[in-house]
UniProtKB/Swiss-Prot annotation:
Zn(2+) binds at C7, C10, C44, C45. This is DNA-directed RNA polymerase subunit Rpo10. Belongs to the archaeal Rpo10/eukaryotic RPB10 RNA polymerase subunit family. It comes from Thermococcus kodakarensis (strain ATCC BAA-918 / JCM 12380 / KOD1) (Pyrococcus kodakaraensis (strain KOD1)). The lineage of its organism: Archaea, Methanobacteriati, Methanobacteriota, Thermococci, Thermococcales. Its cofactor is Zn(2+).
């Protein structure tokens, strides 16, 4: 839902890389190459960025009581 600040497994900071990753992948670059360029080498960190889905805009529609 919200951009992952850290890797869920190892705790490495990923938030500073997320928007660059997203921008480059949407521009058509290969996700694996982008992760290599950003220095994300651990498979747990790669999984965290690759599998993240932004749902915050859809969730914000509902009221909170």
């Amino acid at each position: 839902m919200i951009v992952p600040v850290r890797c869920f497994t190892c705790g490495k900071v990923l938030a500073d890389k997320y928007y660059e990753f997203k921008k480059r992948v949407e521009a058509g670059e290969d996700p694996g190459k982008v992760l290599d360029d950003l220095g994300v080498e651990r498979y747990c960190c790669r999984r965290t960025l690759l599998s993240h889905v932004e749902l915050i805009d859809q969730v914000m529609v509902y009221k909170v009581y």
